[in-house]
């Protein structure tokens, strides 16, 4: 519906309208109104079709991540797979490989291919802190689901050290330290004990 009267607007005006609509959807998602994932995915698809998501000819890594996240939440795994390949080279070279690899890992995880996801996470170089921590969190989930408590314990220790060494600021630090603490608690109450 946003693009029904696209001819009345310049590309820049369409881009601004599109971003307003996407930001609304993201705010709704952030307050647990998950039905807006479908709205967001529709907006992303239309934006890709109309080129309103490109900035200076590039698709930002954040937009790429958000598109993948919306697609995965909507269960559109095949579409996400095609999107990732089609738009990989639309990202700036600096973040291209790590962003692509991380999102490939998320797709593998969504498909239940945990070992494949882990392999993708372990081979990529995540110099970007905003990507490194989510990659570590995904690895944490995989170790837990693979029932590997020793590996998980080592991962938690390394992750805590990383967070303290990098001096992660604000709520990121708190959120990831809470994730570590709660996972550690799960380990100590023997959740891996199937008896």
Sequence positions of predicted segments:
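Amphipathic alpha-helical repeat scaffolds of TPR domains
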Residues: 11-31, 57-69, 99
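Active-site-proximal binding-pocket segments
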Residues: 98, 112-138, 143-155, 162-163
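"A position-specific structural signal for the A-helix of alpha-solenoid helical repeats
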Residues: 20-24, 62-66, 99-106, 110, ...
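Loop-centered beta-sheet repeat module
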Residues: 37-47, 51-72
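Long, ordered, amphipathic alpha-helical scaffolds
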Residues: 157-195
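Solenoid-like repeat scaffolds
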Residues: 3-14, 45-57, 85-95, 122-131, ...
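Specific register positions within alpha-helical solenoid repeats of the TPR/Sel1-like families, i.e.
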Residues: 26-30, 72, 109, 144, ...
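Helix-turn-helix repeat elements of alpha-solenoid scaffolds
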Residues: 1-3, 32-45, 71-83, 109-118
């Amino acid at each position: 519906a946003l693009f029904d009267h696209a001819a009345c607007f310049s590309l820049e005006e369409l881009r601004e309208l599109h971003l307003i609509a996407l930001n609304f959807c993201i705010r709704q998602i952030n307050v647990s109104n998950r039905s807006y994932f479908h709205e967001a995915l529709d907006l992303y698809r239309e934006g890709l079709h109309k080129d309103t998501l490109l900035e200076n000819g590039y698709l930002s890594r954040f937009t790429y991540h958000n598109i993948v996240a919306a697609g995965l939440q909507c269960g559109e795994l095949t579409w996400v797979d095609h999107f990732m390949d089609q738009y990989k080279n639309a990202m700036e070279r600096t973040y291209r490989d790590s962003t692509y690899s991380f999102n490939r890992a998320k797709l593998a995880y969504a498909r239940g291919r945990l070992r494949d996801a882990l392999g993708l996470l372990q081979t990529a170089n995540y110099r970007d802190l905003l990507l490194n921590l989510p990659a570590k969190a995904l690895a944490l989930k995989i170790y837990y689901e693979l029932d590997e408590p020793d590996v998980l314990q080592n991962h938690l220790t390394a992750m805590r050290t990383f967070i303290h060494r990098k001096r992660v600021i604000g709520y990121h630090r708190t959120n990831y330290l809470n994730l570590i603490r709660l996972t550690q608690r799960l380990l100590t109450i023997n959740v891996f004990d199937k008896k």
